[in-house]
Swiss-Prot record:
Subunit structure: Monomer.
Keyword terms, alphabetized: Antibiotic, Antimicrobial, Bacteriolytic enzyme, Hydrolase, Protease, Secreted
EC numbers on record: 3.4.-.-
Subcellular location as annotated: Secreted
Dependence of activity on temperature: Optimum temperature is 80 degrees Celsius.
Major subcellular location class: secreted
GO biological process, one term: proteolysis
GO MF term (any one): peptidase activity
pH-dependence of activity, as noted: Optimum pH is 7.5.
Keyword Secreted on entry: yes
Function as written in the Swiss-Prot or TrEMBL entry: Peptidase. Has bacteriolytic activity.
Protein name: Proteinase L5
């Protein structure tokens, strides 16, 4: 899980 540009998203 990473936070970038105020958006949290999951990465493999």
């Amino acid at each position: 899980a990473t936070v970038q540009g105020g958006i949290x998203y999951r990465m493999p």
